[in-house]
C-alpha cells in the first residue's frame, strides 16, 4: 500500500513540471499540483496514521500497547503457570489417591488374612484346627481325669494312712495304760506283802502303807506320763 502511495506522489510531481508548459498555464497547473499535493499529503498522512495505528500508533501509544501486551503476556504466563501447577497438583493428587488406594488395598488384604487366621483359615484349615482342638481337648480331659484320679488316690491313701496311724496310736496308748495299771497293782501288792513281812506296829504299817501307796500312785502317774509320751513319740 505504501509503495502505491509513493508512486502516485512521484507521478504527480513529474506531471507538475512547468518546463514543458507556458508560464500562465504553469501557474494554474502549479496551483492544481499544490492542491493535489496537499490532498496527497493529507491522504499520505492519513495513510501513515492508519499504518501507525496498524503497527502500534505513536510512541506513547506503542508504549501503552507494549505495557498492555506485557500485562497480557504476564497474565498468560501466570495462567499457564497456574494451569501447570494445577496439572502438577492433579498429578500429585492422583498419585496420592493411587498410593492411598494401594495402602487401603494392602491393609484390607492383611486384615482379611488376619481375620481368616483368627477365624480358622480356609474350610480345610478350620476342619484341621477343629480336629486338633478336639484332640487337645481329649488330651486335656484325660490329663485332668488322671490328675483327679491320682489326687483322689493320694488323698484316699493319705486318709487311710492317717486313720491307720491314728488307730495304731490309740492301740499303743491303751497298751501303755494297761501296762502301767498292771505295774501299779503289782507294786501295791508287793509293798503290802513287804510291809506284812517286815511287821511293825499297826500305826507304823498304816503310815508306811499310806506312804507307799502315795509313792505307788506317784510311780504309776510317772509311768503313765512316760508311756503317753512314748506313744506320742512313736
Curated annotation (Swiss-Prot):
Gene Ontology MF terms in the entry: neuropeptide hormone activity
Entry-annotated residues carrying Phenylalanine amide: 83, 147, 162, 226
Propeptide regions on this chain: 27-73, 87-137, 151-152, 166-216, 230-234
UniProt cross-references to PROSITE patterns, sorted A to Z: GASTRIN (PS00259)
Keywords: Amidation, Amphibian defense peptide, Cleavage on pair of basic residues, Repeat, Secreted, Signal, Sulfation
Residues spanning the membrane: none
Localization annotation: Secreted
InterPro entries: CCK-like, Gastrin/CCK, Gastrin/cholecystokinin_CS
Top-level taxon in the UniProt lineage: Eukaryota
Purpose of the protein: The pharmacological activities of caerulein are quite similar to the physiological activities of gastrin and related peptides.
Family classification: Belongs to the gastrin/cholecystokinin family.
Name of the protein this chain belongs to: Preprocaerulein type-4
Organism: Xenopus borealis (Kenyan clawed frog)
Source species taxonomy: Eukaryota, Metazoa, Chordata, Craniata, Vertebrata
Amino acid at each position: 500500500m505504501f509503495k502505491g502511495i509513493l508512486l502516485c506522489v512521484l507521478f504527480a510531481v513529474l506531471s507538475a513540471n512547468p518546463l514543458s508548459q507556458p508560464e500562465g498555464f504553469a501557474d494554474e497547473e502549479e496551483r492544481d499540483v499544490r492542491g493535489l499535493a496537499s490532498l496527497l499529503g493529507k491522504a499520505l498522512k492519513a495513510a501513515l496514521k492508519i499504518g501507525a495505528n496498524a503497527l502500534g500508533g505513536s510512541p506513547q501509544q506503542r508504549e501503552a500497547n507494549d505495557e498492555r501486551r506485557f500485562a497480557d503476556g504476564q497474565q498468560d504466563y501466570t495462567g499457564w503457570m497456574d494451569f501447570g501447577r494445577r496439572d502438577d497438583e492433579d498429578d500429585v493428587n492422583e498419585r496420592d489417591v493411587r498410593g492411598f488406594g494401594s495402602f487401603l488395598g494392602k491393609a484390607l488384604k492383611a486384615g482379611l488374612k488376619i481375620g481368616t487366621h483368627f477365624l480358622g483359615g480356609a474350610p480345610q484349615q478350620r476342619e484341621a484346627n477343629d480336629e486338633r482342638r478336639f484332640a487337645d481337648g481329649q488330651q486335656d480331659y484325660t490329663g485332668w481325669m488322671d490328675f483327679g484320679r491320682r489326687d483322689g488316690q493320694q488323698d484316699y491313701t493319705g486318709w487311710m494312712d492317717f486313720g491307720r496311724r491314728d488307730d495304731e496310736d490309740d492301740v499303743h496308748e491303751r497298751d501303755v495304760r494297761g501296762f502301767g495299771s498292771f505295774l501299779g497293782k503289782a507294786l501295791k501288792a508287793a509293798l503290802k506283802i513287804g510291809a506284812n513281812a517286815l511287821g511293825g506296829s499297826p500305826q507304823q504299817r498304816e503310815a508306811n502303807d499310806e506312804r507307799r501307796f502315795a509313792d505307788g500312785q506317784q510311780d504309776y502317774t510317772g509311768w503313765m506320763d512316760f508311756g503317753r509320751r512314748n506313744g506320742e513319740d512313736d
